[in-house]
Each structure stands twice: as C-alpha cells, then as structure tokens.
Amino acid sequence: MRTALVTGGNRGIGREVCRALSALGDHVYLGSRDVVVGRRVARAIQSEGDIECVRLDVTSGEDVSALSEHVGENLDVLVNNAGIYNALPFRRLSVDDVRQSCETNMLGPFSLISEFLPKMNRRGQGRIINVSSGYGTFSDRISGPAAYGISKAALNALTVVASQEAEGNVEVNAVCPGWVRTDMGGDGAPRDVSEGADTIVWLATRPADGGRINGQLLRDRKVVQW
C-alpha cells in the first residue's frame, strides 16, 4: 500500500487526487487548514483505501514539522497542491501580495520537500509532484496574473533544483493541470477535476520500472517546455 500526502486536499484538484489514490487502495493524508471541512471531505470520498485528514497550513513551520513527525519515514507520494490565486495586475500589486503568493505557492512546497525528500532518498523511492501552471512557464512568457505567475515560476525553479537532489528511484516533477473547473478556475473552465488530476495520479502511481521521469514539467502525461 502506498502512502500519500496531498496538500489542499479538501477541494478541487486536491480532493480529486485524494479520491483517486484512495480508490487505488492508498493510505492518503488529506492536508487541510480547516480540519472540520477536511474530515467531512475525507469521509465523503474515501474508497478502497483510507483517507486521514491532517491539519496543514503549508505556511506554518509548526504544522509542517508536526506532520513530518506524524507521518514518519514511510511517505511514498507528496503532492504539493495547495495554492492561492491573486488576480491583481502588476501595477496594483504590493510587496505583501507577492510575498503571500510566494509563501503559499513556493515556500510551502519548499518546506515540505525539505522534510520529506531526505526521507525518500534514504528509502530510495518516492514521488514528489508540484502542481504548477502554464502561467509560470517562460515558454508562455509567464502570462496571466503577475503574483500567481511569479510564484508558479518560482515553484518550477524549485522543482528543477529539488530534482537534482533526488536519489535512486525518487522523482521530483511539476504538473500543469490546465484550466480546471474548481473554486479557483471558475465555472467557465473547459476541464473537469478528473482531467486536472489525471497526470498527477499517473506520476504518483507509475511503476518504478517504467523509466525515470525527473525534473520535468508535464501536461496530459507528456513533458512540456518550462
């Protein structure tokens, strides 16, 4: 049985990833800032496996440390999904706006990777998947809302740097889920959550003998340009 941690697992893409991994028999830690909501979601979606809600604000060092101790050494999959979306244009952004976006969208994943990548390296196996965006890619000229694009570009850089520290069968990658119908994406988005979650779940569950994918950005199960 795999063990997976999904941040921001109480809604949207994160919720669907939790549901899909549970249906495959995994033990899933559903990370949520609001444990009341998180527990309600966990009860609603757990399937063949087991979903355990854990309190996690990714910007809280105390939460990250406590969770690392609770989970221990045997985490197989880390999905850094929690994120915030600031839609303000560049000319209206404050330093605090950009700081808040980066704290959640990049430094939160950095804290969790710093905790769990060494443990995965010691075991020689593990998958870390950062949920990014086309708005954070240089190939798309970091288009879209400025603070969001800056923070996702930083997350992409973190993915590349962390992948260079991955050993054995440990993989660190980023996924662009596309424009998905969630609270963040809105009702007009063309993709549903199952489409947004598909590549994440695929990376999390690929067999170890399927060829190593490491330090890449993927969309629809294919490597795309940063």
Where are the model-predicted features located?
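Canonical Rossmann dinucleotide-binding motif of NAD(H)/NADP(H)-dependent dehydrogenases/reductases
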Residues: 1-29
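Rossmann-fold scaffold of SDR-type NAD(P)-dependent oxidoreductases
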Residues: 7, 75-83, 130, 173
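Conserved glycine-rich Rossmann-like NAD(P)H-binding loop of the short-chain dehydrogenase/reductase
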Residues: 24-40
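Rossmann-fold cofactor-recognition segment
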Residues: 46-62
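Active-site Tyr-X3-Lys motif and surrounding loop/helix of classical short-chain dehydrogenase/reductase
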Residues: 66, 88-92, 96-103
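Catalytic loop of short-chain dehydrogenase/reductase
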Residues: 84, 91-95, 127-167
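C-terminal helical subdomain
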Residues: 167-170, 174-180, 186-226
